[in-house]
Amino acid sequence: MFELDFRALQELIRSQRAKVYEKFKRHVSINDLLSDRWETAEFYGFGEGTSCYNNVLILGDVRVGKNTWIGPNVVLDGTAGLEIGDHCSISAGVQIYTHNTVNWSTSLGV
């Protein structure tokens, strides 16, 4: 059975945080310390060279082209399909929603 050494894990996190702060002068979440933004984008099937923060909320059918940057705390709602092209920059906190306007408005959003 796998036994986790929490003290070693805490030390690893402290060490990684210090390295990131020294290099970039900023603090990042544990998720961002342990996962790679390009790996996250690849997991979602986004285009080559695209980076996507771990805390992005992705709903429905979202397609993203090559070399696009998706910042932290972004919401991409592809409920009615969403396609973002190549070489785009989606800033932190941006929220993009799609839906069938006629159906949505006549159903009172239900």
Please identify what each model-predicted range represents:
Residues 1-43, 48-49, 87, 102-103:
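Terminal amphipathic alpha-helical/low-complexity segments used for targeting or macromolecular assembly
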Residues 30-35, 44, 55-64, 69-110:
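Flexible, glycine/small-residue-enriched loop-and-beta-strand segment within the central core
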